Amino acid sequence: MGAFECSCFMSKPFLFLTVLTVFFLSFSQVATPLPPHISCSPGEEALFNGHDLSEWQAQDMSYWSVVDGAIVGTAGEKKIKGNQFLWHEREVRDFHLSLAVRQVPFAANAGIQFRSQPRAGGSAFGYQADVGKGWWGTLYHEHGRGILAKSRVTGEEHLNQEGWNQYEILAMGPDIWLFLNGKISVALHDPEGERSGRIALQVHGGMPQRVEYKGLNLTENPTGGIAGSNQNALREFLQK
């Protein structure tokens, strides 16, 4: 099936204005450059149609369903046998992805794979935007290099423990940014990393849990720019 008409969880201009405003207020006193502003592109599309799992596959689909317009990963009251991944069928390179995530219990773990590939046995290899108590906003490399950058957004007061949290991933060449609830959590220059791959949703193995994902909106080859700064300042902001 082709791309679906996009239905954003939050209007893009409002979301990015909020991101830039909050970030500026937090860091302007120490002359920290602003994160990149990504324009709302006509090419934005929904990766999930809100009704079924068309264009998504998993080694074991019994863990995955659609409930009330969200993708749900769970085994009910049973423990989850190993990490489970639901893969979107296409590969992407440079992109901006926004989505909302809700997790019960809050102490559980999940994540969003990107620039990743499935491995034999059902595991994954590649970047992960982590989800879970003590892990939200962290950039992890699944079955590879481990933690690449810990979240700058610390403290549970920045998270909605009982509801939806907004996640954004921006990958442009070797540079990666993660945004959590409108605040930048990671900015990493990673020349060793993968430059393309697939997107997948994870429910972590172990304790019974339920993770929900909705509003998955993708823009490929987004337009990058700097609000109140320049390209040199952006590079200085990235972790080396």
Q: Language-model segments: what does each one mean?
A:
Residues Q29-K240:
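Carbohydrate-interacting regions of secretory-pathway proteins
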Residues C6-C8:
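Cysteine-centered motifs
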Residues F16-S26:
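Bacterial N-terminal signal peptides
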